[in-house]
Amino acid sequence: RKERHRYQQGDLELKEAITNISHDLRTPLTAINGYLDLLEREEKSETVHCYLSQIQNRTDVLKNLTEELFRYSVVTSFQELKPERMDVVRALEESLLSFYAVMQEKGIQPEIELPEEPVFRELDAGAVNRIFSNIISNALKYSDGDLSVVMDKNGCVTFSNTAHNLNYVTVGRLFDRFYTVEASRNSTGLGLSIAKLLIERMGGSIGAIYNNDKLQIKIIFAK
């Protein structure tokens, strides 16, 4: 019992630390971006322009990491979700549309199969959008050039893509907090763990299957 209490206390302290760190980083990052915008308007040599471009890129990465940490701290704070009757088909369509530019840039032509009729569920709209966005973002990040999204009439959604850089071990850890497939500092490894936490809080489930270099992530929303 003491061990459990110690674990819960440690987990609470970790969440508080993440919240504080992400919050403290947001203000200086906003200031840095402001100064970079001002410098972009000044005349400068090609070398200085190159340096500024690198600084901007790394600042954007840090900003994205900070925002992801902040979102994670919000999700794990167990703020009350607000279920409402919503069309899951439309929510998925909107999420896919928001990634259209990224897909174009990567040369990915997604194969999409959605029900013609709406699929209504009592869900938190913001949480559903976050779930879809995190899964699509992850799929595009590690895809070898393809993406398939299929939803059946019961609202079960399957995201599939070829991913030669994965294996059964990495797939088994995809939903772990802070786990990243690559030893990269460009990701916190929280995207899929946030998706899992949110969907389970709404009574649904999520899982991953890896077979013949194909990754499938399937989510089922509670009826």
Name each model feature, range by range.
Residues A139-L140:
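Short helix-loop "hinge" at the ATP-lid/N-box region of the Bergerat-fold HATPase_c
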Residues E84, Q109-V119, N154:
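Conserved catalytic submotifs in the C-terminal HATPase_c
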Residues G191, A195:
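Short alpha-helical Gxxx[C/S/T] motif in the catalytic ATP-binding
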Residues E84-L97:
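A conserved beta-strand-to-alpha-helix junction within the catalytic ATP-binding
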Residues D146-C156:
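Short beta-strand/loop element within the Bergerat-fold HATPase_c
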Residues L166-F178:
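Short conserved segment of the HATPase_c
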